[in-house]
Amino acid sequence: MNKFKNIAVYGGGSFGTSLASLAAQNCNNVTLFLRDEAIAKEILHNKTNVKYLGDIKLPAHLQATTNLDIIKDFELIIIAVPSYAFDDSIKLLKTHSISKDNTLLIATKGFARNPTTLFSDRLKTLLPHSPTAFFVGPNLAKELAKNLPASASIASLDIDIANKIAYNLSSKIFTTNVSSDIVTLQVAGALKNIFAIKSGIDLARKQGENARATLIVAALKEIAILSKALGGMQKNSDILLEGVVGDLVLTCYSLGSRNTKFGYELGISSDKKQFLQEYKELVEGREALKLVLDLIKKYNLHMPIISEVASCVIPYVIPAKAGMTYESTQQCLRRNDI
C-alpha cells in the first residue's frame, strides 16, 4: 500500500500537535499548521509546544508554519480544531484551494452548528469532492506525544481511504482499525464528552465505581439511540470499536480528561452557578450539550443521561434538579429496544 508523501495537521493545540507527532513517526514530511507565530517558531527551533504539551519533545523533523498558502500541496490533511471552529476552518481551507487531490482526516469531535448536524453532512456542502475520513480513539494528547501505546478507529465511506490512512498511522505501539460507519464514530466522539461530565460529577458525589461502570453501559445505549436516528449502527458490533467504547471509557475514567475534570469540579463546587459562570477553560462536552438537545428534539428521542447533565450544566435550558442522581442511568438501562 502506498504511503502519503506528505502530511499536514491543521490545528496547533494539544491534540493537533500530538497528532502531528504521531504522523511523524511514519512520515518524514509532516507540517503542523497553526495561527500562533510564536508557537510555530518554538516548534521549529525547540521542538516543544510548552503552552499545550509542556516540555514533551517533538520529533526532530516535524515542521510548523502559519503559511496556509502551501497546505494545498499536502496529500493528507488532518483537521484537529475545536468543534466551534470547524465550519470557519473548512471555509478558510477552501479559500486556499483544497480540492479532491487532498484527503481529509477529521479528528475534531462534536457537531457542526447552524444548523446542528454531523461534520460529514457539513462537508458534503463545503468540500463535496475531497476524500474524507474520521479519526476517533482513546487518545490523551500528552500520551500520544510521548509515543505511549494507543489505538484509534479510522472511518470512511470509502474503505480504501480508511485503510490507506490506517496504514500510514499504524506502528508497533499505535494500533488502528477501520470502519465504514462514519455516523457512529462521530456521534460517539461528541457524546462521550457529555458522559464524562456526568462521570466526574458521580466521582465528586462519591457514587462509587459500580455506578461509574454502569454509566458506561448506559452511555453506550444512548450513543446507539442517536446514531441509529442519524443513520448509523448498521451493525451492532460497531459499538465495540476503539473509537466508541475505548474512547468513552478513557474519557469518563481519566481526570486527565477536561470533561471529567470539569464534572468533578462542578460536583464539589459549593456555588455551582458561580462556578459555571467563571469556568473559562474549553470543555467540549459543555459545548456539545445544546447541539445534542437540538437533535433530541428534532428526532423526538429519549436520552435521560444527556438531559440530566444538561439540567446541571445549562439549567436555563432544562429546569435544574437538586443534583445529579443515578435515576437517569437506571432509566437508560431499563430499555431493551436498543
From Swiss-Prot:
One GO BP annotation of this record: glycerol-3-phosphate biosynthetic process
Intracellular or extracellular location(s): Cytoplasm
Amino-acid positions noted as binding NADPH in the UniProt annotation, renumbered to this chain: 14-15, 35, 109, 141, 258, 282, 284
Pfam families linked to this entry: NAD_Gly3P_dh_C, NAD_Gly3P_dh_N
Catalytic center residues: 192 (proton acceptor)
Keywords from the UniProt entry: Cytoplasm, Lipid biosynthesis, Lipid metabolism, NAD, NADP, Nucleotide-binding, Oxidoreductase, Phospholipid biosynthesis, Phospholipid metabolism
Keyword hit for Manganese: no
SUPFAM superfamilies linked to this entry: 6-phosphogluconate dehydrogenase C-terminal domain-like, NAD(P)-binding Rossmann-fold domains
GO cellular component annotations of the record: cytosol
Protein residues bound to sn-glycerol 3-phosphate: 109, 137, 192, 247, 257-259
Record-annotated membrane-spanning stretches: none
Disulfide bond positions: none
Main localisation: cytoplasm
Catalytic activity, as annotated: sn-glycerol 3-phosphate + NAD(+) = dihydroxyacetone phosphate + NADH + H(+); sn-glycerol 3-phosphate + NADP(+) = dihydroxyacetone phosphate + NADPH + H(+)
A GO molecular-function descriptor: NAD binding
Pathway where it operates: Membrane lipid metabolism; glycerophospholipid metabolism
E.C. number(s) listed in UniProt: 1.1.1.94
InterPro entries for this protein: 6-PGluconate_DH-like_C_sf (IPR008927), 6PGD_dom2 (IPR013328), G3P_DH_NAD-dep (IPR006168), G3P_DH_NAD-dep_C (IPR006109), G3P_DH_NAD-dep_N (IPR011128), NAD(P)-bd_dom_sf (IPR036291)
Function: Catalyzes the reduction of the glycolytic intermediate dihydroxyacetone phosphate (DHAP) to sn-glycerol 3-phosphate (G3P), the key precursor for phospholipid synthesis.
UniProt similarity note: Belongs to the NAD-dependent glycerol-3-phosphate dehydrogenase family.
Name of the featured protein: Glycerol-3-phosphate dehydrogenase [NAD(P)+]
Record organism: Rickettsia rickettsii (strain Sheila Smith)
Gene: gpsA
